[in-house]
């Protein structure tokens, strides 16, 4: 089953990298968007700007601050292995 990764809208380079690795990527516009994700990637500029950390999701949240798209992909993969 394909893992669903939620990302913030400003992370379009990460979106492409994750899609190339076979993940189903969705843009998180509201905290509700994070609820069905297997993992969430946020910018970290304001760690809770969308309320992602407060949602009922049990998915891991990765802060992308200072990381390349490849590094973020590696972190996502670590969460599932």
From Swiss-Prot:
Source organism of this protein record: Bacillus velezensis (strain DSM 23117 / BGSC 10A6 / LMG 26770 / FZB42)
A Pfam family the protein falls into: UPF0180
Family: Belongs to the UPF0180 family.
Protein name per the record: UPF0180 protein RBAM_013970
NCBIfam families named among the record's database cross-references: PRK03094.1
């Amino acid at each position: 089953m394909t893992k669903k990764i939620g990302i913030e809208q400003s992370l379009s380079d990460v979106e492409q990298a994750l899609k190339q690795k076979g993940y189903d990527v969705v843009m998180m516009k509201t905290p509700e968007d994070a609820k069905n994700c297997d993992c969430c990637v946020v910018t970290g500029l304001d760690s809770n700007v969308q309320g992602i950390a407060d949602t009922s999701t049990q998915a891991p949240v990765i802060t992308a601050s200072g990381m390349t798209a490849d590094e973020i992909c590696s972190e996502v993969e670590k969460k599932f292995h």
